[in-house]
Amino acid sequence: MNIFTLSFAKAKSLDESRFCVVSIARFVPRGFKGVRCYSLAPSRELLHDYKSGLSESSYKVRYLKELGDSVHIHEVFESLVPFCKGRDLVLCCYESDGKFCHRHLLSDRVFQLFGYRINELSC
C-alpha cells in the first residue's frame, strides 16, 4: 500500500477500486464518500486562529503538537489499513497543490519520524 496526498477537488476523479480516499480535514465537501480521519485534521481552534491571522510558522508548531508523538501517528495509520483493502491510501484536504497546508506538514512529519515519503499524487 502506498500513501499519497491530494486536494479534495482532484480526488473526485480517482478510481475507488484503486484508491482509498481519506479526509484529514475537519470538514468534508458535500457528497464525500471516503473515510474521515479527524485524528490527522487540525483542531477547530487551530483552523479558527489561522483564518484570524495566525502565522504559518505558529500554525506548524501547533499542528505538530496536536498530531502527537510517533506512537500516536503510527496507530492512526494502522487504524486506516482495514479500510483500504489493498488499495493505495490518499489523504485529502481542501488546499490546492503548492499552497501552505497541513497535509504537507503531516507528510514531512511522517518522513522525519519513519523515513517514509508521502508524495502528492499526480493525476
Question: Residues of each region from the PLM?
Answer:
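Residues lining hydrophobic/aromatic ligand-binding pockets adjacent to catalytic sites
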Residues: 1-123
